[in-house]
């Protein structure tokens, strides 16, 4: 079973959020430490937030690969996307506009891949 991890992109602040968890109803909350009252839990408006799923894979440097990451394998660059229809991750070749499905990712030397950015910070 893959680990259930995610990261949150805040579209308004144009940054990834830390210390966020998702409630059982899908509501986003943020932990704030070192407040006057200790630890605080704050509701986050999810309208301008994007939840990016963890693929369960790591690049050659041990970094976790998430939806939205841009990876390089040999001399080709790919964008990782979530395919909701098949509940899997796809890999789109940015230079050739070819799309590969989940099983292809597992067989495509992903262990030799390197994360070179993401679609939010490296447009």
State what each model feature region is:
Residues 1-123:
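Secondary-structure transition motif
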């Amino acid at each position: 079973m893959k680990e259930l991890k995610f990261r949150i992109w805040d579209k308004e602040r144009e940054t990834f959020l830390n210390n966020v968890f998702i409630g059982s109803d899908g509501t986003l909350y943020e932990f704030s430490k070192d407040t006057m009252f200790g630890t605080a839990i704050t509701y986050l408006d999810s309208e301008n937030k994007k939840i990016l799923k963890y693929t369960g894979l790591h690049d050659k440097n041990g970094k976790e690969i998430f939806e939205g990451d841009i990876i390089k394998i040999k001399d080709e660059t790919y964008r990782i996307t979530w395919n909701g229809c098949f509940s899997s991750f796809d890999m789109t070749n940015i230079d050739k506009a070819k799309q590969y499905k989940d099983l292809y990712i597992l067989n495509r030397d992903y262990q030799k891949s390197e994360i070179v950015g993401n679609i939010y910070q490296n447009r």
